[in-house]
Amino acid sequence: MREKLSICLGSLIALSSVPLRVYIVTDGPSADVARQVLADASAKASSDVLAELLHVDDMLAPLLDLISFLQPHFSSAGYYSKKLFFLSTGVHRLFPEGVRHLILLDIDLQLRSDIALLHHHFALFPTGTIMGLGYELQPVYRHGLHKYRQEHPGTTCGEPPPRGNPGFNSGVVLIDLEAVRNSSTYKKFLSAEGVEFLVKKYSFRGNLGDQDFYSLLGWERPELFYVLPCTWNRQLCEWWRYHGYADVFDEYHRCNGSVHIYHGNCNSSIPSVR
């Protein structure tokens, strides 16, 4: 984890042309490591960096009501069972109203471009949009929606772009906190009843935390989401290529253009900088 955090923070800070306000969510044992990594990265900063470490338990305590109905549907006994993977769904509760925009980043990322360029995508959100995420670049939800897709021939849910919506990946999330707070639609679905409706309609049982919820909500109410270009979350994992989906894998995994953020999910190696 230390190496991943070092790569992510180091690239974020080194390439930023604007002052940064950075929040690192951590636990007690990891806090000292995070402080050292942050100090090392900040030494190479070209802009001001204001950083704060937030304890995961303090962040999650106000969200336990949400987690209580999300976790049974969108987690397993493995890595993604941790409550941390539902933090983004209620993060609008945790920041004061003066904070309008938030960019959430996994730590298994390496930036190749200035984060200010990513922030510019907030200006592209249509009215009513609350979040921006890139598509999932594997047929994860083609698999997860197998029953729904059998019962609804011709559906675009779980299909690769451009003809369909393959679901989202939450490695990079742009959140308009004000829009989330003002969205009656989001509030409606971020409830025990709303989640139950979604999982029943789509015959879905997931294990990837918040991105499962966003994917379901994106199929049901696509107007809530801005689709971030794949180059801002260029996922590298190819697990599904070797587990039953080799024939369609490239349709999902294709991502043309200069990569701004590499995402080394499932411990994939990130290409070296040339």
Positions of the model-derived regions?
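Glycosyltransferase catalytic domains, chiefly GT-A lineage
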Residues: M1-R274
